[in-house]
Each structure stands twice: as structure tokens, then as C-alpha cells.
Amino acid sequence: MQGPHLSLLLLLLATMGAVLQADTVEELTNTRGLIFLEDGVWPPSSPPEPLCLVAVRGEGDTSKASLTVVGGLHSYEHAFLEAVQESRWGPQDLATFGVCSTDSQTTLPALQRLGAWLGETGEQQLLVLHLAEVIWEPQLLLKFQEPPPGGASRWEQALLVLYPGPGPQVTVTGAGLQGTQSLCPTRDTRYLVLTVHFPAGAWSGSGLALTLQPSKEGATLTIAQLQAFLFGSDSRCFTRMTPTLVLLPPTGPTPQPAHGQLDTVPFPQPGLSLEPEDLPHSADPFLETLTRLVRALRGPLTRASNTRLALDPGALASFPQGLVNLSDPVALGRLLDGEEPLLLLLSPAAATVGEPMRLHSPTSAPWAAGLARRVAVELQAAASELRDLPGLPPTAPPLLSRLLALCPNDSRSAGDPLRALLLLKALQGLRAEWRGREGRGRAGRSKGTGTDGLCALRELSVDLRAERSVLIPETYQANNCQGACAWPQSDRNPRYGNHVVLLLKMQARGAALGRLPCCVPTAYTGKLLISLSEEHISAHHVPNMVATECGCR
């Protein structure tokens, strides 16, 4: 019974030491395992909000890593940290924290991680933020105090700790939470914990928006019931216990075991830009320039090896594409009608190193003048369209101009149509690949990035001040959906349909889709807006204003 009172007394003594500008720093130790250090350890540039540095003492009186508290550490927050540190996560401990199950919750791993951190020696700090503001209507919003300057950018996960009063089992959703989470309080429950992903919105935005739905069908919580449930009574101080936001330290790389077999994968070597001296020598300036253009548009490659690819013409003839007789104008006309890739097989004599690789043979390939003019016209059109594509590297236009100079550019002259055909097919392939990159950029919501992960709800604040008719709110948390749509589909939203399942399977098999599956909102909630009309001020509940769930469509 004396532990919490002693903790408060020691904290008071530490604060008095800072006020008196003590020259020495002493550790004030209580009997429950936490060490309160004097405020004198903080530099003069500390933020104006009072800070408390707390270190955890483990078994054997060993010094542990410290945690930072914005404001003073309450006795019930102190008790929560001790309960986490001492838990062995059996059934009784799960009941203490209101954990429903061990297989479908994200809360238990986060609590275990916090407990392991409290029991280890380290230099990183744990940040504890107190509640600054709560809004009950039209939606529950919890806003917390700001962390010290420069100390919030590296926090990626947090625990929202509730010190509950009596209440039912509920399902909790909201922006910032890691999916839908459940709370299962019992008579033995002292704490309820929710996992928050990227918690910066808890202090920089409008706050954490939470929706609590009782598990009993048709039941709802009134504001009075919600207040009694989330803000438990502190019988010692005759006050309410307010929620706390505990920012977990970033997860470091997992150490490899010292025993067993270790599979190692070397880091890929950085790509090397192929300078002119790095390119394989070719006696034909056309082929050499075309190689430079292809490599400039397809990005930097690793240094070329001396390995040559041996192609068997007999095996290639059995491929579905088949072989095209370039001396047949009809076959060449069909080739121009499509944009399929073209593979030219040269004779071994023409491919000899140091010998010019001539692609034209006027005596063996009598082209019709009309077909040659068509090749020249389409070549100029493809080159013009390629120049207009956004984001081309600066080396591409000069190389393209040189290639056109090496090809017949007069539509009235047959010239060397085989060389022009080769350039035309190359430009068609490069144009299609560059368009595909642009399309993948536009479909970024579907494919996502390395930091986005799977399709999930993300925080998005919308500014309504541009809508002059809307008075309140000026900004609100509308949320958005972002992330990868891939097979197997994430089970965060079980209401996806068979149509998107088939699309995702086709995408996984590499099938071409006109539209990739996209991460979009699948459920919304309304928002209360106060607007100004010509006659009066009115309040309207506008539907579909806040995205609450995401899925692939």
C-alpha cells in the first residue's frame, strides 16, 4: 500500500531538486523497481512541458533502459508498466489486460514486446504521452500531448492504454488502429490496450478517432456509459484515470542465432551506368547507337559479361511466334500491323566480331516502294511519340536523332527499309514499356510501395476551409485507402467478392489486365457539418464522409 505513495513522494522530491538547481544527480529508488531521476539531467533546451525520466530496475539491481514521460507519471501508469514487466502471459495475465484471444489480436505481441523491452538493458527510450483533449460528439476523439521536439519522427507503433470502468466486450475501429480490434473486459481486468500504427495523428491531427461497438447485436453505448467505461475511477485520488499513449521504441534487426545452418543472401551490387567505353564494340554504328538507346531507356544495368547467348534456330522455329520471311512484302505488311516483339536471326558470318553486321540486302529482299514509305512514316510517328513521353532521360533524344539520321527519313525513297523496320519495332517495344511504367505509377494505390504494405486504411486529413459554406469543422479526418492488392488477399476485410479474387489470381499468374485491382474504401461513416446558408446556420449529418474500411476492387 505504500509503494504508489512513496513513488509520488520521490517524484515530488525530484522536482524540488530541479527547482533548487541541484549540482549533483542522485538516483531516488523506490521499492517497486522504477527509478526516478532528478529533472536536473535534462538539458536547458528542454521543451516547456514538464518531463520525467524514469529508468526501470530489473533483477539483481541492474540498470535498465529509460522511458520519458511528458508530465508526471501517475500511480496507475506506474502500476501498468509493472504489470507488463511481471506478466508471463498466462490466462490470468490475459484477463488482466482484457485480451480476447492469442491468435487474432495484434495487442498481445505488442505487450510482449513492451515487457521484453522493460526487462532488457538498452539505450533507447520509451515515450509516454498524456491525454490533452477528448471530444465525445459526434465521434469519439482522443488527442494527446505533443512529444518533445524531434523525438516523434521515429515512433511507428504505440499502445493506447485504457484504465477502464465497468463495460461490455466491444469491437473497436478507427483511423490509426491496426485493423479491427476487440476488448474483452472481465472482473479481473485492470487495463485495456489498443495497438496504434503510426501514431503521429494522435497529437498533430484531430486526434485518434475511435468507434466502439458492443459485441451484443443491436446494443449501443451512450456517452455516459462510454465515459464510465474508458475513464475508470481512481479510488485513491477520487479522480478519473485518463488514457495514456505509450510509444514503443523502433524495432531493430533481429539477431541471427549462433547455432544451426544460416542461409546468407549477398546484397546486390549497385547498378553501374554503362559509359561509352563499357559498351560492347560493334562495327555497325546503327546497332551500337540502338543498343545505347535501349539501355538508356531501360535503366542502368550491371556490367556486361562476356557470356554470349546461343540461340538454336531450329528450336526458335517451334515457338508460337514462328518465323517471318523478311523478303515477303505481305509478311512484312502483317508485321507492321502489330506491335509484337521482333527477333532477327543473322547468319554466323554476319555476326562475326569485327565484321560489319549488314542488315540490308537489296538483291535478296525486293521491297515494294509503298511498303517502304509506310515504314518511314510510322517510324517518324513512333519517334515523335517517344520524344513526348514524360520523364525520358536526357541522353535519349540525341541517340534517337542519330538513329533517325542513320535510317531513311524520306518517305518517297526505299533506302534501307530493313534497318528502318528494326528501329521501328525497337521504338514500339520501348514505347510500350515506358507506358507500362507510367501506368504502374498511376496505379500506385494498387501495387503500393515497400513502406505501404497491404491494402489498408491510412490517415488523411481534409481541409474544409476552401468550402466557404462549411463553418465547422475546418478540418477533419477523412482517411484513405492505400497499399498493395495482391494474392493471397489480406484478411483485414472479409467482405471482398469473388470477382476481385479472380482478378488477383490472374495478376499473380502474370496475365495482362486492362485495369489492375485497386485499393478503395468499402465502408463509410457520416460526419456532422455545420453550414451557413443565405438565411440561417444549420447542422447536417452528411453520409459517406469518413472511410472506415478498405478492400480491393
From Swiss-Prot:
InterPro entries documented for this protein:
AMH_N, Cystine-knot_cytokine, Muellerian-inhibiting_factor, TGF-b_C, TGFb_CS
- Positions annotated as pro-peptide in this chain are 23-445
> Which residues does the annotation flag as glycosylated?
N325, N409
User: PROSITE patterns, alphabetically?
Assistant: TGF_BETA_1, TGF_BETA_2
Q: Got a GO cellular component term for this one?
A: extracellular space
Per the UniProt entry, the disulfide pairs are C455-C519, C481-C550, C485-C552
Q: Does the keyword Disulfide bond apply?
A: yes
* Signal peptide extent: 1-22
Subcellular location(s) of the protein: Secreted
Q: Which UniProt keywords apply?
A: Differentiation, Disulfide bond, Glycoprotein, Gonadal differentiation, Growth factor, Secreted, Signal
Q: What protein name does the entry list?
A: Muellerian-inhibiting factor
What the entry lists under SUPFAM superfamilies is as follows:
Cystine-knot cytokines
Functional note: Plays an important role in several reproductive functions. Induces Muellerian duct regression during male fetal sexual differentiation and plays a role in Leydig cell differentiation and function. In female acts as a negative regulator of the primordial to primary follicle transition and decreases FSH sensitivity of growing follicles. AMH signals by binding to a specific type-II receptor, AMHR2, that heterodimerizes with type-I receptors (ACVR1 and BMPR1A), and recruiting SMAD proteins that are translocated to the nucleus to regulate target gene expression.
- Residues the record marks as site: Cleavage: R445, S446
Q: Does the keyword rRNA processing apply?
A: no
Q: Name one GO molecular function term.
A: signaling receptor binding
Q: Per the UniProt entry, what are the Gene Ontology biological process annotations, in alphabetical order?
A: anti-Mullerian hormone receptor signaling pathway; gonadal mesoderm development; Leydig cell differentiation; Mullerian duct regression; negative regulation of ovarian follicle development; ovarian follicle development; positive regulation of gene expression; positive regulation of SMAD protein signal transduction
Q: What is its main location?
A: secreted
